[in-house]
């Protein structure tokens, strides 16, 4: 598996466990790319849903992908602070087409005061049965929910103070 290079513009593709496309982000600028970590940024990028509907993101976002964890984190810069959306997902893969991951339904929304809510447990239960997630996936995802909770409480990784602001400043250097 390769990895995207700094300054490169890539698509992000999210899939479901059964291999079907879930969502695509048209353009994300890579700010850091290594075998184990990718940090990207986008602002007002086109998003295409699996049913063909499209929408445009409303605010700048910093995207954090790690090869050793089963989640990715999007930090969204809004007027009243940074909001985070954490997707429980497979670790990322990259090919010349896009940065890719499998979305496993569960999400954690984190507010600027670092309180958070676990979302979509019902969707996870439904898809787990429908797509026959193996028990090992359930174990891995539950462990990674706990990792995320610890990171949020410890302000670690993408939740560290100034993490999103620092990477957003770097992103501004690449804007056209």
UniProtKB/Swiss-Prot annotation:
InterPro entries: DUF402, FomD-like_sf, Ntdp-like, SA1684. Its EC number is 3.6.1.15, 3.6.1.6. Keywords: Hydrolase, Magnesium, Metal-binding. Its cofactor is Mg(2+). The keyword Nucleus does not apply. Belongs to the Ntdp family. Has nucleoside phosphatase activity towards nucleoside triphosphates and nucleoside diphosphates. This is Nucleoside triphosphate/diphosphate phosphatase.
């Amino acid at each position: 598996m390769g990895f995207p290079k700094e300054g490169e513009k890539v698509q992000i593709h999210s899939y479901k466990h059964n291999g079907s496309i879930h969502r695509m982000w048209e353009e994300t600028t890579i700010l850091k790319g290594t075998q184990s970590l990718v940090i990207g940024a986008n602002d007002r990028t086109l998003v295409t849903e699996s049913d063909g509907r499209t929408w445009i993101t409303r605010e700048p976002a910093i995207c954090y992908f790690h090869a050793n964890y089963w989640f990715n984190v999007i930090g969204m810069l809004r007027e009243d602070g940074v909001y985070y959306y954490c997707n429980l997902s497979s670790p990322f893969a990259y090919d010349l087409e896009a940065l890719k991951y499998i979305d496993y339904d569960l999400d954690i929304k984190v507010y600027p005061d670092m309180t958070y809510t676990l979302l979509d447990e019902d969707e996870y239960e439904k898809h787990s049965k429908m797509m026959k997630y193996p028990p090992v996936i359930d174990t891995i995802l539950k462990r990674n929910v706990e990792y995320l909770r610890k990171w949020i409480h410890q302000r670690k990784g993408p939740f560290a103070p100034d993490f999103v602001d620092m990477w957003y400043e770097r992103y501004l250097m690449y804007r056209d």
